[in-house]
Amino acid sequence: MSLKTPVLLVAATALLTACGTATTATTARTDATVTIPSDRFLPVISQSVTGGTVTFRNADADAHTVTSLPGAAVAFDLVIPAGGTRTLKLDAAGAYRYYCRFHAHYDPKTDQVAANPGADHPDEPMAGVIVAARNG
């Protein structure tokens, strides 16, 4: 298990907390883009607002998914072919954790995402977080 996942969760929580201030809410982007090169989500942490969208652009040679963790308040599972694009609309504020189920797996015992055996980046599971702040 990598230390990066807990660090990402702490960073996402801090970012979500900061989104509650009036200044941040008025300057938050409504839409975000996540690029998928070489079995990674970049940026790992994205910011949007309720009613906004996150567009995932697969710049990799193989297909990927953007899959919510089991038990998430909002479930999603987008399959994105190589070179494809998919968009996710965010209707509720919160931190949306996701991963690629083709290249990583979720362990409910540890609440962590880990890279699958043979992954391009075994120390960095293919996972990310979207932080959606209340709009307005």
Q: Where is each model-derived feature located?
A:
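N-terminal edge beta-strand
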Residues: 27-50
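A mature extracytoplasmic/lumenal domain signature
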Residues: 38-40, 58-60, 70-72, 92, ...
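C-terminal motif of bacterial Sec signal peptides marking the signal peptidase cleavage site
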Residues: 15-18
